[in-house]
From Swiss-Prot:
S-S pairs: none
GO cellular component assignments: periplasmic space
PTM entry text: Binds 2 heme c groups covalently per subunit.
SUPFAM superfamilies: Cytochrome c
Signal sequence residues: 1-20
Gene that encodes it: cc4
Gene3D superfamilies in alphabetical order: Cytochrome c-like domain (1.10.760.10)
Species the sequence originates in: Stutzerimonas stutzeri (Pseudomonas stutzeri)
Key words, A-Z: Electron transport, Heme, Iron, Metal-binding, Periplasm, Signal, Transport
Role, per record: Diheme, high potential cytochrome c believed to be an intermediate electron donor to terminal oxidation systems.
Residues that, per the record, bind heme c 2: 139, 142-143, 187
Residues noted as binding heme c 1 in the record, renumbered to the chain: 34, 37-38, 86
Annotated protein name in UniProt: Cytochrome c4
Amino acid sequence: MNKVLVSLLLTLGITGMAHAAGDAEAGQGKVAVCGACHGVDGNSPAPNFPKLAGQGERYLLKQLQDIKAGSTPGAPEGVGRKVLEMTGMLDPLSDQDLEDIAAYFSSQKGSVGYADPALAKQGEKLFRGGKLDQGMPACTGCHAPNGVGNDLAGFPKLGGQHAAYTAKQLTDFREGNRTNDGDTMIMRGVAAKLSNKDIEALSSYIQGLH
């Protein structure tokens, strides 16, 4: 791992984390509405809605906080994370509610997905090797070889995630429609190096990773 990546990991790990101190048992009683899109246990049956089960608690909490901030009426451009389907849904929830919900979904077991064999080889090449000639690091540096992520550093679990959802996020990062990757803009930088075919292959490989 080169010095630039080590520095980046330390920076994101220290400054990019949301404090997570939720109660999973309490959270179970607060996720009824979430289940309509994400599944009652966080294993979303719909490919456009992310699986939350088994996701890192710190990452989940940060996304909930960012979505709440970005969905507030009149929120300045670039603040938080804008998810149209989530508009207004988090407004009534307190910080403790968000912490409890993150803890609950993080405690659930994520379901396994499957990769398209026709795309898996190219996807694996990108995930494990990046595009070093273009300055794009391997995904394994932050998300681990098996896609479990690094919760302490706030890097999300990717393995098993719906390919359609992952592809949408990579495209949004590339196009600047998602910007909550911190001052380092690491995901925007990575996604800028990916073609549509790269994103399709990488997303499919990630869906089958476990």
